[in-house]
């Protein structure tokens, strides 16, 4: 869907891929995407780097952390995050194999619930993870963006430290999935 829109729109637009990204779909967006919000595996990072290299680009990425109680949501747990950051850091220093991606932050989605105390707890947990790792820095790793909060909970997310919110439904209305 994004590729169809990209072909019709001005080429100076910065495109963000929001949502779960399948590894086999990266090749379709690597030519133009500026930021991929939902990177949830080391394998996906490798594929983004591979496809970005083909286009001589650097693609910014947010690592998605699983903070919700819902199992249907994607994301890394804290151990997987730490493994990626260690592997990424060592890959950077050893052979700079990830020169076509830059990890610029973390993102997470809270549980879909009316319980604001639970949502706040999940947002604060992600903020603590972000703060714990925000001092890490290499040529392609610097956590500057904390993306949490959507149209229904963005104000709470901002109060918990979010630096980027996803509020497309508030601006454009609900999506029509056909």
What are the roles of these predicted feature ranges?
Residues 1-152, 160, 172:
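Conserved alpha/beta-domain cores
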Residues 163-164:
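Divalent-metal-activated hydrolytic enzyme cores
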Residues 128, 167-178:
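Alpha/beta catalytic cores of nucleotide-metabolism and tRNA/nucleoside-modifying enzymes
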